[in-house]
Amino acid sequence: MSSFLTTITQNFVCTSRLQVRFYAKRAYKKTKNAQLIRAPSRKTLEQPRQVFSFGNFSGLHLPQIKTIETSRKAIESISSFSSLRIFPTVRAAMVQEIKRGYNFKNTYMASKDDLEIKPSPVQVAAIRKINQPRNIKSTKSRTPQSGAEIFSELMAQNDAKRLKVFTIAAETGSGKTWAYTAPMLTKLKEEDMELFNISEATYAEAKAAPIIRALVVLPTHELVDQVYNTLRSANDQKFATDEVVDPKLLSDAKYARFLKAPDQLNGLHLNIKKFGAGDSHRVLFDGIKQRVDVLVTTPGKIQGLAKLQNVDRPFRFFNHVQYCVVDEADTLMDNSWVDDTTAVLRRLTKCKDLVFCSATIPKQFNRTLSKMFPDEKSIIHINTPALHKIPRQIVVKIIDAQVSPYNGSKTRCLAQALYAIHNDGTEAGYVKRILVFVNEKKDVAPLVDVLVKKYGNRAEDIVGITGDTKPEERKGLLEPFLKPAELVEDDIDQSKIKVLVTTDLMARGMNFVGIKNVILMDLPNTSVDLMHRVGRTGRMRQSGRVFVIIDKKTGKSWIKGLPNVVKKGITVG
């Protein structure tokens, strides 16, 4: 157990002993009704939180129980998007977009109209926190008279501009993208409504300004495409405004005037842009000739603007960013990325909301945040109760390559696992997609080669991706894994299985739709990597299987306990 966990346990036990003594004294104290107050047993009071944590493998920070309990109470009290503070047209577009991406294959629902969309735990917790109105009591309606009123007005203006920092941490595949985009789009729409109600000319002038209002940064171009496509899809959704907006709001003159404006009818009508792989700086600058509401990109693409010799002040367009999301923050704040990420953040001088979003909270990430924001109270943490727990709908199986007939060959073990999955009768009629993770990119190509040449798999069924694979080629190879499973007869290659061999590069944030099988060819180096790899299946409460192949070198006794950890819902540390 790490020193961090040891300290927590010691503090917990110390506090519990005081509680035991307190209850022991009360145990014999008579109440008015002559009843005895029973003391909780010492075993109950001193039982610490169970954690699956071993030596250097342990890389995850344990959030405070108080933070998790706060989220739990909010989650239990809300079961509908209508109960959350979301701008009405944003809510309508979001629900339709979520339905659009739902996989209806192998379900009893005939259409998306039969599907009731409910917010996930992280969406409830994050939207409630981030969308809380700032406590601003402005005196703008009249001229401040006294010194106290002037001071109050200045404080209100300062609070309106003050940076708020949020962290969102929730299990993989839990709907984190909408957990941060719903509040962001809501605030953009509310600001537009405020400008429109000042005057239509003020609103029109703001829309024509060459600025970026909100920024989402991610570590890879695949993730840029993924988030951009979600936002663009929501922006493209059409609906009758008077049917999706509460009649009470439409009777409010402030909402009615804005929502009935020609550029607000029947959709979001936002300007969503991406600055991704292969895009020149000219694509970005041409897109900012009028206001960009949301830009999705990587820190590297933004920092690359510094190399431009023929563009005057290329970063000036970022001076007005008010909302920024650092998605896959555990990656973007690690040693490989942190310089580029923090350089981008320093340019956002007018940012009001800064959101760090991640599926895990590595210890290193927590230390980095503490250095950036030494006052712990300046960060608002949003964690779900299931954080750092492998979902119970995922079945984990350990395969020992040391036993017969594998005789120490992990590759033979993998080939047999692929054969067994191919013939196990699951996903009948559909192409089975399987992800295989290795630790080193140098092992990807040789493994693909041996699976084809030695074990008789078709070349079109086994593909490999590393950081060296060109973006356009990567996009084509990934396509079958990023959409719902196809019927075998509809697949261009008539494949019954498709296998992707890759590294942790593809384990971060990628929404592999409906993937049922993940194989860990190599034992992950840390618990952080384990959670991300396992999280490519079992997304959005769907079932999945994870096969961990071990041999003499990696067959440590503790990893064999992983299936039991999942069944008992134990936190991974």
Swiss-Prot record:
SUPFAM superfamilies: P-loop containing nucleoside triphosphate hydrolases (SSF52540)
Compartments, as annotated in UniProt: Mitochondrion
Transit peptide: 1-39
Keywords, alphabetical: ATP-binding, Helicase, Hydrolase, Mitochondrion, Nucleotide-binding, RNA-binding, Transit peptide
Motif Q motif location, chain numbering: 116-123
GO MF term (any one): RNA binding
Cellular component annotations (GO), alphabetically ordered: mitochondrion
Broad enzyme group: hydrolase
Residue intervals of the Helicase ATP-binding domain: 157-379
Main location as per UniProt: mitochondrion
Entry coiled-coil feature ranges: none
Keyword Oxidoreductase carried by entry: no
Catalytic activity: ATP + H2O = ADP + phosphate + H(+)
Annotated ATP binding sites: 170-177
Motif DEAD box, chain ranges: 327-330
Superkingdom: Eukaryota
Enzyme Commission code: 3.6.4.13
Comment, domains: The Q motif is unique to and characteristic of the DEAD box family of RNA helicases and controls ATP binding and hydrolysis.
Protein family: Belongs to the DEAD box helicase family. MRH4 subfamily.
Reported function: ATP-binding RNA helicase involved in mitochondrial RNA metabolism. Required for maintenance of mitochondrial DNA.
Protein name: ATP-dependent RNA helicase MRH4, mitochondrial
Organism: Meyerozyma guilliermondii (strain ATCC 6260 / CBS 566 / DSM 6381 / JCM 1539 / NBRC 10279 / NRRL Y-324) (Yeast)
